Amino acid sequence: MATVVAAAFVVGGLLVAGSTPPARRSSPVTVPIRGVRVYLDVSGRSPDHPGETHLTFDGNPRTSWWTDAYLGPDKAHFGGLYDGEGLAIHLARSARLQRLTVMSSTRGWAASTYVSTHGVAMSAPLADWGQMVSSRRNLQGSASFDLRGRSGDWVLLWLTDLGPAGLANVAELQIRASA
């Protein structure tokens, strides 16, 4: 009798094992970056180091783009000259975006993120980027931002606080999206 019960369990297990498994959620994939530009919502001002933005996606964490160094009592907030400066990240394709990872050695920095389905003029008002997606403060080096599944092919990393040193760097950017 025990042999018959054991055989029933084995046969039952084989039937379950042969059935279609439940669908798995696919892992996020890295979306290639086509280019990065410095974004300012203040016309008439020169962006900080626009020729070095390619260093944010060159695969080398020892190279980076830097803001200018700001001085004075409000140096963490761009010397009181304006509200922020950003990196407009143009992706190789539109996707449902999950996460932006920023490699940085800056201490005490803050930033917000925006996602767009179209390019925005580099001196257009910040409102042209649409609704803010996420925001983080008092970051101690590298950080990740939740892009909440928003669809787009442009991401803006909008720096709002440079930390106590009065300057910030971005060594590498990576964007992950739904497969």
Features from the language model and the residues they span:
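Hydrophobic single-pass membrane-targeting/anchoring helices
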Residues: M1-A23
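Aromatic, loop-rich ligand-recognition surfaces of beta-strand-rich domains
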Residues: N60-L126, S144-A179
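Disordered, acidic Ser/Thr/Pro-rich linker "stalks" and the adjacent N-terminal cap
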Residues: A17-A92
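Generic signature of intrinsically disordered, low-complexity, basic-rich segments
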Residues: V4, H49-E52, R107
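Solvent-exposed serine/threonine-rich low-complexity stretches and specific carbohydrate-binding patches
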Residues: L126-N138
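Aromatic sugar-binding surface patches on proteins
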Residues: G141
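Generic hydrophobic, helix-prone segments enriched in Leu/Val/Ile
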Residues: I33-V36, M132-V133, W158
